[in-house]
Amino acid sequence: MVAPSKRRPPVMADVAREAGVSHQTVSRVLNDHPNVRPDTRARVEEAITRLGYRRNLAARALVTKRSRMLGVVSFDTTLYGPASTIYGIEQAARTAGYFVSIVSLKTLDVDSVRDAIDYLSEQGVDGVVVVAPRRSAGPALESLPSGTPAVAVEGTLRGDVSVVCIDQAEGARLATRHLLELGHRTVHHVTGPPDWLETEGRLEGWRAALEEAGRPVPEPLPGDWSPHAGYAAGRSLAAMDGVTAVFAANDQMALGVLRALSEEGVKVPDQISVVGFDDIPESAFFSPPLTTVRQDFDQVGRHCIEVLLRQLDAGAGTCERLVVPPGFVVRSSTAAAARVP
């Protein structure tokens, strides 16, 4: 075995000598070129392992004109959805051979988003994913350099930016129809905060399902994604006459609703059925276990990378919209409406 000097890390030429092949053959193996014999590929891979060879990504970037770096702009990563989406993005990017640079924003204003995009652009990222599903993020995306491959989670006002989203309205329809099919006359709704695209989609789907069924549409109760907001809404609902079904716009608010109803002596689901949205891991352990709309955030994150890489391969001017269907998980927090004496 011909070992490289201990004073420097192994380079591609060392791998070629070790495997008894040309520099070009090593390059083809590293780039997963199909025209390499299996036994030759195995020899090269064994040489790479023995020598501890690591690719020089900076040198590769000079040749390919790609940094192998993707940027992510995110808002409120303390929430389950954005955090899970970013995890899916990072895992998919790593599998594809890309690094991820993440900028987390405390406030979602135009200047903050523009500063984040400028910061990522200075790093020479090949593309950008924006995980900030609020209307106020839309104008800031105008600062994206023309031709920069970009994907927005949930939506954007720009026609040249791809979108990956879950069908929020359909998820709300699933929740509302489930309760109507159980015999409930109508369904009360605890909304998410204003400006969020998910809030709009779920409100739209809930209202549409009630109107399509010819049922009365109650005034929605305001929320902010937190259990505290759900608790306040639950106290209000417990004081109302004729409430038998509640659809909360996320599982955290549903948890607050359940707590408030329990404190008021209202039995779930015997007296009031409750449905959430997200299917967070804890929802199966609520009391009672929560019926909820399931969002596959990991799949959303992976689709973001798939769409972004397709844009990189196809060149500027290509964009697409990919919609992920929601699921629905029935547990113990919903039941047939109680008969009115």
Where are these regions (language model features)?
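Glycine-rich phosphate-binding loop signature in dinucleotide/nucleotide-binding domains
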Residues: L51, E122-G124, L182-G183, L237-V243
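Short beta-strand segments enriched in small/hydrophobic residues
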Residues: T25-R28, L62-T78, H178, T186-P193
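Flexible loop/turn connectors
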Residues: M240-P341
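Hinge/beta->alpha junction and helix N-cap segments in small-molecule ligand-binding domains
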Residues: L57, F75-S84, I102-D111, V164-L174, ...
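Alpha-helical recognition/docking segments in bacterial nutrient-uptake
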Residues: M1-P10, M69-R177, E181
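Periplasmic-binding protein-like
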Residues: G124-A132, H188-T191, P220-L221, D241-N250, ...
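N-terminal helix-turn-helix DNA-binding module of bacterial transcription factors
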Residues: M1-R68, A338-P341
